[in-house]
Amino acid sequence: MRNGTIRYPGSDAAPGPDEMSAILRRCGIRLAPARIGQLWTYHQLLREFNPELNLTRIHNFANMVLKLYVDSLLPMNLVELPSPLMDLGTGPGMPGIPIKIAMPELEIVLAESRQKRAAFLKMAVERLKLEKVEVVGKSVGSSFEVPVKGVITRAVESVGATLERIAGCLDRDGLAIFMKGPQCDAEIGEALKRFRGEYRLWRDIHYTIPHTRNERRLVVFQRLGPPTRIRKETAMKRHGFRKIESENNDLYRDIRKLLTSRGIRKQQRALVSGSKQVHETLRDFPDDCLAWIAPGQEMPPPEGAPGHMSWYQMAPALFETLDVFGTRTPLLLIKVGEIETWDPVEGFPAGCSVLVPFQDPENVGAVIRSAAAFGAVQVILLRESAHPFHPKALRASGGAVLRMKLRNGPPLENLPENLPILPLSAEGRDITRHVFPAAFGLLPGLEGPGLPDNWRRKSFAIPICKDVESLNAATAAAIALYAWSRSGSQTKHSPAPA
């Protein structure tokens, strides 16, 4: 090797199988002469069809051996490759064909959606006389259900996108093997967060292609749960399921009404959205879960979901209407119990009770989340308030709506002035200098108009820069709750995670 370039015997002449074998051996890869012959035939096919099909941009012989064949074969020295193994987005057949040549006992699935390349793969498999090789000439998505024990890919698609793509085919305990460059920490982190509980990071191996400066990283995820096809079969036996394909379906119409406070009040049901909140609700409140709502049948309920829960398989367009936040993940239909009424005559228990007049459901959810985070004893929803189980409120609360003690209160105008209530208004006194009572109500103002004059006169404020007129009402309430929680006068109440 000189100046990073491998020199092989007879390099002034046209290279042949012996020169290919020499480079492979120097990289720690030893193949029998018959295997070298197959790899040489494959190399010749690449060279022959490359002008027509643009199979590779690498043309120098030594670089082709190093960056294509050695790169394809090194993973078999780093991890035990499972069988059947699918090469996803294989292009001209890498790493799948070199791996198959080196490990003839392995069953290989070559997946390539581009038809001309798929045709090349079929021809190459025939010319090389490779057995137990299947060419899949279409795009692989979550509905692809041919079972495999492993998936390997050199494609540039993100780890998370690929894990979603192979949901239907990779078996439980199967390996998803990613041949990456060195800078892939962000996509690994995103995938671990997104697929928590479904996959674990099994191996993360940094290496370099021998005799080059090309850094590589073999990132291997192991599947913890069953593939979609098994989950579907199990879920269909465990859960009653209904297909809903028309917007005129009565059940769909009822569910669509849950996008409004009125519908929630009337039906005493609500929709939970977002993968994290949905799975936490399933885990913590299984008895309240009524139905799993998903687009079609490709996202079945998870293992361990309560058996009484139904599975509604929505037509994609109908699901999109319900998925108001565009999560593209299943929704959860839950029952909402009666919210107990608070009578001002009973006053406030020890600690802070948050009085909520907000008409914006996002503000309602945000203040409930803050109340839970800072240990408020209860949230009293005044008559003006939006419903706490409105989809926007549920989402903004981070699930705190399900955990916080909620009460229904009177209209703002009917609040007795003799109660120990701390109103919040921009013109009030500095609340950070106030000594909080042992039991009191915190009253932020309505969005826009704020508080009535009788409450403004005795109000407290969050000190802010003079250049800023005011804070968002839910933000002001959160800061006031923080000030109370740090004041030393807080009656300890178990706060929920923020």
UniProtKB/Swiss-Prot annotation:
Annotated SUPFAM superfamilies: alpha/beta knot (SSF75217), S-adenosyl-L-methionine-dependent methyltransferases (SSF53335)
Pfam families: GidB, SpoU_methylase
InterPro entries documented for this protein: Alpha/beta_knot_MTases, rRNA_ssu_MeTfrase_G, SAM-dependent_MTases_sf, SpoU_MeTrfase, tRNA_m1G_MTases_N
UniProt keyword annotation of Protein biosynthesis present: no
Cellular localization per UniProt: Cytoplasm
Keywords: Cytoplasm, Methyltransferase, rRNA processing, S-adenosyl-L-methionine, Transferase
Region (Methyltransferase TrmH family): 231-498
Region: Methyltransferase G, residue numbers: 1-230
Binding-site residues, S-adenosyl-L-methionine: 89, 94, 154
Extent of the signal sequence: none
EC number: 2.1.1.170
Gene Ontology molecular-function annotations: RNA binding; rRNA (guanine-N7-)-methyltransferase activity
Cell membrane keyword on record: no
Reaction(s) catalysed by this chain's protein: guanosine(527) in 16S rRNA + S-adenosyl-L-methionine = N(7)-methylguanosine(527) in 16S rRNA + S-adenosyl-L-homocysteine
Main subcellular location: cytoplasm
Leading EC class: transferase
One GO cellular component term: cytosol
TM regions (residue ranges): none
Gene3D superfamilies in the cross-refs: 3.40.1280.10, Vaccinia Virus protein VP39
Sequence similarity: In the N-terminal section; belongs to the methyltransferase superfamily. RNA methyltransferase RsmG family.
PANTHER family noted in UniProt: S-ADENOSYL-L-METHIONINE-DEPENDENT METHYLTRANSFERASES SUPERFAMILY PROTEIN
NCBIfam families referenced in this protein's UniProt entry, alphabetically: rsmG_gidB
Protein function: Specifically methylates the N7 position of guanine in position 527 of 16S rRNA.
Protein name in the entry: Ribosomal RNA small subunit methyltransferase G 2
Lineage: Bacteria, Pseudomonadati, Thermodesulfobacteriota, Syntrophobacteria, Syntrophobacterales
Gene coding for it: rsmG2
